Regions:
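Glycine-rich phosphate/diphosphate-binding loop of Rossmann-like nucleotide-binding domains
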Residues: 6-23, 27-29, 147-216, 228
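N-terminal glycine-rich phosphate/adenylate-binding segment common to multiple enzyme folds
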Residues: 49-154, 237
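Short acidic loop-to-helix transition motifs that present clustered carboxylates
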Residues: 111, 213-220
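Glycine-rich phosphate/nucleotide-binding loop
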Residues: 45-48, 107, 114, 222-323
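Buried hydrophobic packing segments
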Residues: 21, 25, 198, 290-301, ...
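Glycine-rich phosphate/pyrophosphate-binding loop and the adjoining helix
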Residues: 135-181, 185-187, 205, 310, ...
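Buried hydrophobic positions in well-ordered alpha/beta secondary-structure cores of metabolic enzymes
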Residues: 11-14, 67, 131, 168, ...
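N-terminal beta-loop-helix "entrance" segment that forms/cooperates
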Residues: 33-57, 222
Length: 345
């Protein structure tokens, strides 16, 4: 059965790295017989240019009907300060598709260890996943600003907490089988609920170890002993901060993919970096995060584990061979990096 994939190239370097990702997917499909079709749609600044809105109605329609969605990058300086901005399209898409779980793998490639701000011995063996709740918590509660007082409401239901923690346990079941639930249980009522639910869900996964960590000590451990983590799960605010902290461990955003999942609809796969308008159109953007996002899609949405691993190993082999784009210390162009990965599939 043909899989329908929507490609949202977006802005800046987005079109260049999207092409790279799709070229790798096409090359892999020729080897493995993966049957798919691509529907390219405007989004972000490109959506504003095409239809006056960062998430055009037709783009949303095809996204709802898709099996998976690939997003490259959004954001353009021409919309800075504008009432309608490209980034609003991503927030709207997350809301419309109920993308409640953000998944961010953090893995340090041996050939790129020197880029990390941490000592090599600190990052040896780092390979963990941050699972962040994306649609609840303080970002989505009431925000009240008065003349001399302000308050923000942090609100979570049992069901919201349960589904994100269950997602983390499902991921851990196929990894090293350790879930670290991060909260502030010694202070916050929402964290007391969070810990209660985590304990309850853990009973359904007897082969997975559950650990609890307060967010402040977790932030410290992510720097002093990041290799201890397997799967981290946490609420929206803590996840926002910790996932950004984790992204600096590799020393570059150019090799880090992410996924956002809903309960029943299509998932969204994207690099964690921005649109880099300063280098757009020059053919020098690092396509690896986009290519690894394609690998995540194959594994998570389509269950094609071997295909995903082929891409990941090809990326690792290309880096080990010294084929590097400028952001990671080399001179390879976007095209050369992509071709090197395809040659090693």
């Amino acid at each position: 059965m043909t899989k329908k994939i929507v490609a949202l190239a977006g802005d800046g370097i987005g079109p260049e790295i999207m092409e790279a990702g799709l070229e790798v997917l096409e090359a892999l499909a020729k080897k493995t017989g993966f049957d798919y079709e691509i529907d390219r749609r405007p989004f972000g600044g490109a959506g504003i240019d095409a239809a006056g809105h960062p998430l055009p109605d037709e783009t949303l329609k095809v996204c709802r009907e898709a099996d998976a969605i690939l997003l490259a990058a959004i954001g353009s300086p021409q919309y800075d300060g504008a009432a309608v901005r490209p980034e609003q399209g991503l927030l709207a898409l997350r809301k419309e598709l109920n993308l409640y779980a953000n998944i961010r793998p953090v893995k340090i490639f041996d050939s790129l260890k020197h880029l990390s701000p941490l000592k090599p011995e600190r990052i040896a063996g780092v390979d963990f996943v941050v699972v962040r709740e994306l649609t609840g918590g303080i970002y989505f509660g009431d925000h009240i600003l008065e003349e001399r007082k302000a308050r923000d409401i942090n609100d979570y239901s049992y069901e919201e907490v349960e589904r994100i923690i269950r997602k983390a346990f499902e991921i851990a079941s196929n990894r090293r089988k350790i879930v670290t639930s991060i909260d502030k249980q010694n202070v916050l009522a929402t964290s007391k609920l969070w810990r209660k639910v985590a304990e309850k869900v853990s009973q359904d996964f007897p082969d997975v170890t559950l650990e609890h960590q307060l967010v402040d000590s977790a932030a410290m451990l992510m720097i002093t002993n990041p290799a201890k983590f397997d799967v981290i799960v946490t609420e929206n605010l803590f996840g926002d901060i910790l996932s950004d902290e984790s992204s600096v461990l590799s020393g570059t955003l150019g090799v880090m993919p992410s996924a956002s999942h809903s309960e029943n609809g299509p998932s969204l796969y994207e690099p964690i970096h921005g649109s880099a308008p300063d280098i757009a159109g020059q053919g020098i953007a690092n396509p690896i995060s986009m290519i690894l996002s394609v690998a995540m899609m194959l594994r998570d949405s389509f269950g094609r584990y071997e295909d995903a691993e082929r891409i990941e190993l090809a990326v690792e082999a290309s880096l080990a061979a010294g084929i590097l784009t400028r952001d990671i210390g080399g001179q390879a162009s976007t095209k050369e990096m992509t071709e090197a990965i395809i040659a090693r599939l």
